[in-house]
Amino acid sequence: MTRGHKFTGRIVIVGAGPGDADLLTARASAALISADTVLHDADVSTAVVQRLTEARPDLELHPAVGDPAEVAKTAVTAAKAGRTVARLVAGDPFTNDAVVKEILAIARTVVPYDVIPGVAISTAVPAYAGVPLGSTHTAADLRSGISVAALVASPMPLVLQANGEIVADTARDLVEAGLPGSTHACVTVDGSLSSQFSLVGSLDEFAAGAWPSTRTGSVVITVGAEVDKRSRLSWWESRPLFGWRVLVPRTREQAGDMSERLRSYGAVPVEVPTIAVEPPRTPAQMDRAIRGLVTGRYGWIVFTSVNAVRAVREKFAELGLDARAFAGVKVACVGEMTAEAVRDFGITPELLPSGDQSSLGLLEDFPPYDDVLDPIDRVLLPRADIATETLTAGLQERGWEVDDVTAYRTVRAAPPPAAIREAIKGGGFDAVCFTSSSTVRNLVGIAGKPNSRTVVACIGPQTAATATEFGLRVDVRPETAGVLQLVDALAEHALA
């Protein structure tokens, strides 16, 4: 909407959807990322807020405080000061009575505003619970003060937003208003999140206290015969790792793909950094190696990790170089993620292991040095300071000279909070995913050994061997070493 006044600021009312950050619309995401200030409701999910802070660490996020008039005034004042204000609300803005009042208040001013619809809680949560609403249903928010008795004569099923504390009272009121006590209802908390919990029962059972008193907060109560179809349509909660708490001992930057894959299987990933990546203590060795690339010293460069690729890119930027420095140099990688990082650099790797994505797997495919076919007999191997000698020794056995260069250091991270340490040792995690020997050593060092009930998944043979050395039982190992393959193997294990 536009008005005949000139403002550099504006207000965008954005629907956040039911909770899952992936349900933000493309337009909503763009508006939030480009905003100067975000005013958000308390019931906007932590997942959505976290997605924002990761995308825009400098974004100002403030809770919306006060009644609709006060919240509208806060937004209008900021917009008149030239700021773009995103008013972030759970679900869809026009299905929230209080937010509608805010928008009406904003509309009475000269400040330009837009409304970006969100996925409505009243339709999304039943869908995530496996309850089909069909073409006709009745939705109401009991927190707005609507009479339960007035809803009984409305088209079924009923979809009621409420607080968990009043589930029993609501069921009792529905029966007293005329619905049979045998009518089925599904109560869902944390709808669309990996922590979603649903319980099906009759109104009589809920009236008698079937809903757990520990499950507080916002819930969606779906009432009617359609609830009976949940046993066949519960797609979200039937995923193989649904509800599993999985420990991911990696930095947040490295854990992104793994955590996303875990969520796709229904797990709740908990990222606990065990290592920090730092530059080498003396950069001279790395400087000489990079200059050697430019002068034609190397026939091959071998990358064994994303961190190694990142270290070389940073050194290139420091020295004013780009991908052209790789001219005439063949590139080998261990792991698809490492290869993808190289491709992002503008280079296509010549060699990846055809089998096991490990140093041993690469050695099986790496060609021996041939003084006729290979004009240069030297390989550059940029890697961590604590890497094993397996790859270097194997390349030398194949006739290559190897410059084994420390590209980065891995140092042990600070211990996690006490609650996390206790959960690790006490069985508070269903599984742990180890992606390197250093993550095993460092996790045990800073937090202790995982409980014997915890499923231990290791990315490859060397990592598994280290875990065994520390007295851990290795339950899962993918056929092909890789972060995503590791998660897939864990999901298969859960189904076995």
Model-identified regions with their sequence ranges:
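Class I S-adenosyl-L-methionine
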Residues: M1-I116, P212, V219, G296-A308, ...
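Structural motif
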Residues: R10-V12, D36-T37, L59-H62, R83-R87, ...
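Short glycine/serine/threonine-rich phosphate/pyrophosphate-binding segments
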Residues: A21-L24, F94-V100, V119-V125, I166-T170, ...
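A short acidic, amphipathic alpha-helical/loop segment
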Residues: R27-A28, R51, T74, E102, ...
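Conserved beta-alpha
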Residues: S45-T46, P68, V115-P126, A139-A153, ...
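Active-site/ligand-binding-proximal alpha/beta "capping" segment
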Residues: P93-T109, V148-S154, V167-T170, A418-G426
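Short Gly/Thr/Asp-enriched flexible loops that form oxyanion-binding sites at enzyme active sites
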Residues: F94-Y113, A127-G130, R313-A317, V444-A447
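Charge-patterned, long linear interaction tracts outside catalytic cores
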Residues: V159-L160, G164-V175, G181-T183
